[in-house]
Design a protein with these regions (language model features):
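A short glycine-centered flexible hinge/capping loop motif at secondary-structure junctions
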Residues: 168-172, 379-383, 420
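Acidic, low-complexity, intrinsically disordered peripheral segments
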Residues: 402-432
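Small/polar, glycine/serine/threonine/aspartate-rich low-complexity segments that form flexible
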Residues: 22-24, 70-100, 107, 220-230, ...
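Sec/SRP-type N-terminal targeting helices
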Residues: 43-47, 60-61, 84, 98-126, ...
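Short flexible linkers and secondary-structure junctions
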Residues: 22-139, 175, 272, 276, ...
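Periplasmic alpha-helical coiled-coil/stalk elements that build and connect Gram-negative outer-membrane
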Residues: 125-241, 347-350, 354, 396
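Bacterial N-terminal signal peptides
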Residues: 8-16
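Bacterial Sec-pathway N-terminal export signals of envelope proteins
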Residues: 21-68, 174, 214-255, 308, ...
Length: 432
């Protein structure tokens, strides 16, 4: 099991009111915990890390000798001069490469870095899962809030429809006005029903990321509020360069290319190997009425030195390619640093703009609510007509949706800033 370091990022939370007895409560931290334990992608990544850890051994690197046992039983019969021969042999031998140009050490370093890269990939998967859960959780809250807004607009439309029906029964309204109010109400009802489906889909998507049953329902504890605290760009850049996991993985990839270059250089060294063991043989020959039996036990020990003098330029070309790949990996590191810095600057600008957009959306919604309250009285008193009243309802609907989206966008920006600066990984250790 790989030990990874992480910090769960949670926007400031206020606990909700009484919970439904039929539904289990779910906070953002609980959703993160479920996903980190059960997410399908993380389970696969953990298995890959475990496999890389098993491969990272001195045995795979070639440090230790190999021991083998051989046995054979050969029988032959000469037809022209009848002779029957039986040969039984067995042997055990040890082969050990004592020196091969430090290839064993270079191979072990490569295996260690492959395990490190696999662990880094798991860390990236954890970061992505945390970010997806945060946005998935708040997407559910966003869709639920939109449903509440649509419910309010539908209630207003229903009240207007019932008002027109009552006026018609008293002779104060014509069929045209009633039908218009009915169409508006039915349209708002359809929007409300569609939004209910959107809410259920958002919950199912969240359940999938947590590996929960699709039909599982929750009472979501966390409020739909953003954290609007400010950032310093210099601090973000510093954290990104030191803690960004994708950049760390790119550094590990560069080290792997350096290992590959060292492995190719080791091909220019001689190889010194040891072979030792013991052989046993038993031979039986029968010709006519006589037989001959021989037995032998032969221990042996050999040292072999080999050196490739010429390989038609294979080693030279392989080393040249390895050095080219190493230099390309260095360029990729610089490219990654530049790309991440650009992305960070963009995210920082978006975050600051979205803080201001939220303030604008708050003012817009406040004005729309006041206008809606005033227009309802004016509509019933006949100062404005049904078309004006409907326009004001739509303005409120747009303003409410715009504010909810502004909140979600701000949460998204904060989540992306935390991800790119390595904020989901910290000094606290946790087993995954």
């Amino acid at each position: 099991m790989i030990r990874l370091k992480y910090l769960i990022y949670i926007v400031p939370l206020l606990f909700a009111g009484p919970l439904s007895a039929q539904e289990e409560s779910l906070s953002l931290s609980e959703a993160l915990d479920k996903a980190l334990q059960n997410n399908y992608g993380l389970i696969i990544s953990r298995a890959e890390v475990e496999a890389a850890g098993i491969n990272n051994s001195w045995g795979n690197a070639g440090r230790y000798p190999s021991i083998g046992f051989d046995a054979s039983d050969n029988n032959s019969y000469e037809l022209l001069d009848p002779v029957y021969t039986n040969r039984l042999s067995a042997g055990i031998g040890l082969d050990w490469v004592l020196f091969d140009g430090f290839r064993v050490q270079f191979t072990k370093n490569r295996l260690e870095n492959l395990e490190k890269l696999t662990s880094g990939s798991l860390a990236v998967a954890i970061e992505n899962t945390i970010g997806d859960i945060i946005l998935g959780y708040y997407n559910v809250l966003l869709q639920q809030e939109r449903l509440l807004v649509l419910n309010k607009v539908m209630d207003l439309s229903r009240d207007r429809y019932q008002y027109e029906l009552k006026r018609q029964s008293l002779g104060g309204s014509v069929t045209y006005n009633v039908l218009q109010a009915q169409n508006v109400y039915l349209s708002d009802k359809a929007s409300h029903m569609n939004q209910e489906v959107v809410v259920r889909n958002a919950i199912r998507n969240l359940n999938f990321m947590m590996a929960e049953d699709p039909g599982k329902t929750w009472t979501f504890e966390d409020p739909f509020v953003p954290d609007t605290s400010s950032y310093r760009l210099d601090d973000l850049v510093s954290k990104m360069k030191s803690d960004n996991q994708i950049l760390k993985n790119q550094y590990t990839h560069l080290i792997l290319q350096e290992n590959q270059t060292s492995l190719q250089e080791s091909a220019y060294y001689p190889t010194l190997s040891l072979g030792t063991g013991i052989d046993y043989s038993h031979s039986l020959s029968r010709a006519g009425g006589s037989s001959l039996t021989t037995n032998a036990i032969v221990p042996y020990g050999n040292i072999r030195l080999s050196f490739d003098i010429y390989q038609a330029g294979v080693r030279k070309r392989s080393l040249k390619v390895a050095r080219i790949n190493e230099e390309a990996a260095r360029v990729e590191v610089r490219q990654m640093e530049h790309a991440l810095t650009n992305e960070l600057f963009n995210l920082y600008d978006y975050y600051n703009v979205r803080v201001e957009l939220l303030n604008v959306a708050d003012e817009s919604l406040e004005a729309a609510l006041l206008n809606l309250s005033i227009s309802e009285e004016k509509y019933r008193s006949g100062v404005i007509n049904s078309f004006n009243y409907r326009d004001i309802q739509l303005i409120y609907l747009h303003s409410a949706f715009q504010r909810l989206q502004a909140i979600y966008n701000l949460i998204d920006s904060r989540t992306q800033l935390t991800r790119i600066t390595g904020g989901f990984l910290s000094t606290g250790e946790q087993d995954f």
